[in-house]
């Protein structure tokens, strides 16, 4: 692996934020009925993967992808709660805890 630098962590953080934005735009697109939000979602996904590609220059792919996916899911869940009133049931909370535990395990491996 290449030497870790904070710039790679910044790229990863940007990739996570862009993924969340893409998911919110996807919800706003209403199944691509509102095309502008659908196109914005696609652009945000493209930008997220571009940022992730920069992050993996200094972070192991398995770690970067696990963190990107895990934090993206957790933050999208929070965005759904705040913006759309979506709530998790007990199984959903258990799944989120397991997801976070898995991210920690991958990072420590």
From Swiss-Prot:
Q: Which residues lie on this side of the membrane: Periplasmic?
A: 1-5, 57-63, 109
Q: Which domain of life is it from?
A: Bacteria
Q: Provide the membrane-side ranges marked Cytoplasmic in the record.
A: 27-35, 85-87
Instruction: State the UniProt keywords alphabetically.
Output: Cell inner membrane, Cell membrane, Membrane, Transmembrane, Transmembrane helix, Transport
User: Main location per UniProt?
Assistant: membrane
Q: Which residues cross the membrane?
A: 6-26, 36-56, 64-84, 88-108
Task: State whether it acts alone or in a complex, and with which partners, per the record.
Answer: Forms a complex with MdtJ.
The protein's job, in short, is: Catalyzes the excretion of spermidine.
Q: What is this protein called?
A: Spermidine export protein MdtI
Instruction: Report the gene name.
Output: mdtI
């Amino acid at each position: 692996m290449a030497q870790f630098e904070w710039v790679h962590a910044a790229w990863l953080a940007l990739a996570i934020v862009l993924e969340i934005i893409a998911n919110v735009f996807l919800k706003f697109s209403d199944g691509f009925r509102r095309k502008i939000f659908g196109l914005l979602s696609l652009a945000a996904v493209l930008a997220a993967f571009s940022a992730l590609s920069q992050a993996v220059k200094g972070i192991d792919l398995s770690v970067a992808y696990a963190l990107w996916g895990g934090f993206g899911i957790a933050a999208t869940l929070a965005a759904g709660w705040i913006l759309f009133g979506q709530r998790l049931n007990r199984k959903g909370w258990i799944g989120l805890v397991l997801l976070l535990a898995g991210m920690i395990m991958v990072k420590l491996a």
